Amino acid sequence: MKNSLNKAIIIAAKIHKGKKGRNREPAIMHPIRVMSLMKNNRSRTVAVLHDVVESGKITIQELEDIGFDPKVCKAVDLLSRKKGQKYFNYIDNIKTNKLATTVKLADLTDNYLRRKQNRTSSKVDKQKIKKYKKAYKSLTGYSLKSTIDHV
């Protein structure tokens, strides 16, 4: 499984190479932060791969062909929002898989914290924060803010 994590990091680094994320940081930093919140190598592998399929540069089939565990591929597939898919239908699909849910919760937490740290929140930031909170509550039944405030 450790070898899979190494492969996943290499793939994610190649796909995110040269791209910038929020606050103009290298895009790879987000999946690395999400990965760092995971407790085992399977969930770390999913975390580092969670955005790669949406990039359009690799498919679930290619991840399977590389030899990633079917459970990893299933979770990554659920975490890859399909074109035209409504956001909360996407969240409902994630709920069907514990591994995908675990990674999505870490993803939402990281996204929430990055947007909250902006000194001047834009209207878009506020809308995204509201969406993250609603998705988190949908997945857990708990408030994202109250959960983070206790960490």
Label each residue range with its predicted role.
Residues 1-151:
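Active-site helical microenvironments for divalent-metal-assisted chemistry
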